[in-house]
Amino acid sequence: MVSYAGIWSRGATSDRRDPHLPEHTLLAIDAGQTGIKTRLVTAEGTAQEWLFPGVLTDRPLLSQLTTVVAEVTRVTGQAPHTVTFGVSGLTSADDEADALMPHPDLAGVHRIVVTHDSVTSFLGVLGDQQGAVVAAGTGVVTLGVGPEHSTRVDGWGYIMGDAGSGYWIGRAALDAVMRAHDGRGPATSLTSVVQERWPDLEIAYVALQSSHDRVRTVASFAAPTAAHAASGDEVSTRICHAAAAELATAVLAALRVTDAPADAAVGAIGGVFGSDVIRSAFESAVRAERPDARFVAAAGSGLDGAVALAGLESGHPLHERFAERTR
């Protein structure tokens, strides 16, 4: 897979033909909750990028996606031939594709490809390699690809899943602080962190439960937990090691279910892996069961993965995870 980021600047034209360029104008869309990133790539080798506000997963996706296509079409004066979508919060690629294709804002589009953003993240990180990619931020999702099949592990939300995520770590930190407060658990330096936000710990739970932003608030304690682990706080260290074990379990499950080779590639992305304590423990846990696993740096971004999605061969194991419509 070719990573266009870093090769094409906004509006720049290459002086040689890249064999990986699309045959027709391609609009790649990486629709995440932080922002909707787009890249328009032409057959002549030019590329332009735009950034739009992030996806709101509690609202219908259709209008949020069509608005982006309509705006790019307006700015460029011509509808793209192909549009690829990697979308956070997507529940059914087929249903979304069926709704997108006949929409008036896509009237000039001839082909669309729709998938969950875990797929475009995988393609951006590992390209066409077999292996697993775990993306751990506020939430977490792991995607595995083997010789014939692919699988999704976790990503089931903060109530039913997301083990090892930023929310999971933050929730464990708050639990540890309250255990230290009422005598059920050992003292922890995290207590001072929580008291910076809620000086009176005994009413903290009321403020948190009534907050409309409680998931993000809980997840915000993940970073200080990692920092305190690095400074030697035993409680924080246990939490981070437990998170690493959960993330490793997800990756190992993905590799096992897909019959990935012994030397499969493993990519770990997202803010949680900014912690050396977590990353090191995660890699050790994976290697304990998969000693030949290869930990690789990301080859590209989710937007690069959305570009690659357009050229994915029909027999690729990830083909079962996206919907394609043409006219």
Feature locations, PLM:
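Short glycine-rich anion-binding loops that position phosphate/pyrophosphate groups of nucleotides
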Residues: 34, 88-90, 138-141
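Conserved strand-to-helix beginnings and helix N-cap segments that scaffold or border functional pockets
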Residues: 62, 94-98, 166, 279-280
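Short glycine-aspartate micro-motif
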Residues: 26-30, 80-84, 113, 122-124, ...
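ATP-binding/phosphotransfer module of carbohydrate and carboxylate kinases, centering on a glycine-rich
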Residues: 2-76, 125-132, 174-327
